[in-house]
Amino acid sequence: MLTQTTLEQYFRDLEMLVNVDSGQDAPEGIRRNAEFFRDAFDRMGWLTELQDIGPTGPCLVVRNREAEHYDLLLTGHLDTVFPKGTAARRPYREEENTAYGPGICDMKSGCLTMLYALQEVPAEVLEKLNILLIFQPDEEIGSIYSKELMCAWAEKCRVCLVFEAAVDAPSPLHCVQRKGMLRLGFRFYGRAGHAGSMLTNGAVSAISEMAYWISRIDTLVSREKNTTANVGLVRGGIGNNVVAAEAEMSGEIRFEFPEEAEKAKVLIRELYRHAEATGVRVERTLEGYEPPMNPTPQTLAYVDHLNTLEAQNGRTFSIRKRGGLSAANFLSQHLPICVDGFGPAGEKAHSEDEYMLMDSVAPSIRLTAQAICALAKEKG
């Protein structure tokens, strides 16, 4: 039974977590918060392991027992996007039903909900299930150190709940579909020369070639398929009277359908051929790929099941597509059921206005505990 005393302790713990800098320049803060969760699960008698996987801080893996396969994976990230000193400058604060602070909904409250929900589940229920939790230290930089480890664990799991924040709405919005992302970055090398003599001096503009690439990349935008293309950073040249010898651009393609990423790759190969024909050398400076999270039939059936559980609480389990990335993008490729947005409701992540709705905490904890109990009942 979730009591007021328990909720008060939740908010005290949340204040402590939020007031610890946890950006990529503060791995000691990420470690400190990981140790908080490790110690809490140690007291519960669970198996815990802090794994040093990179310079961002440790990844915490928690299990209720050793097992070949796990019924449930709960996961969240301990890092934020904010630089060291942010927590001191704008610490945790509460205003009526709203709590503010760096990383409060993205996603320290979600990580804490995982712990508190499991504390609400009766021991006899936990005995029936094999449960795994992963607290990652590097989601905000693309999970570059933790992804391989997390995917290996996901292969052993049936259901995954990701505790990114639910979207603030009359009925909090969860997520089973996220766009994938293809990251692009290129440096262009032309040939410098006086702009007034470029027709005869052999000068080749790196900026002109880059501009051609941008115009072609923009053709990938599709309202019908909800594909976006954005070149967000460009630079180049040294003066108006000098044909630019160098230029650089970076951007990304976001897509629901994997074939849209393949279409982009075909275009990039074509653009390389164009650059070669115009005398511009192109070097790739950024690359990265995240698959889209698209719901399996099993996931959609599980959403119906969660809606049935929420109906017992007088609520609905609502879902909405999201354009942003999370660990669910890659985890969903490795197991049959994956649902994101299981944390308390909030908005405005990555900004000074980031907030969490305090009255969404108890429903988030209760639903998670109910979902765990239902898994045990299903297992028999």
Each predicted region: which residue ranges?
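Midchain, well-structured core segments that form catalytic/ion-binding scaffolds
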Residues: K147-P297, T308
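Active-site metal-coordination/substrate-binding segment of hydrolases
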Residues: H69-F135, I141, E352, L357-P363
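A structural preference for short, hydrophobic beta-strand core positions in alpha/beta folds
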Residues: L50-Q51, R284-E287, I319-K321
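Short beta-strand segments
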Residues: T75-G76, I134-Q136, L161-E164, R187-Y189, ...
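Active-site-adjacent substrate-binding region
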Residues: Y212-S222, M293-V339
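Acidic/His- and Gly-rich active-site-bordering loop/insert found
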Residues: L2-P102, L126, E310
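Acidic/histidine-rich catalytic neighborhood of metal-dependent amide-processing enzymes
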Residues: M107-Q177, S222, G380
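Zn-dependent metallopeptidase/amidohydrolase metal-coordination segment
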Residues: R315-E378
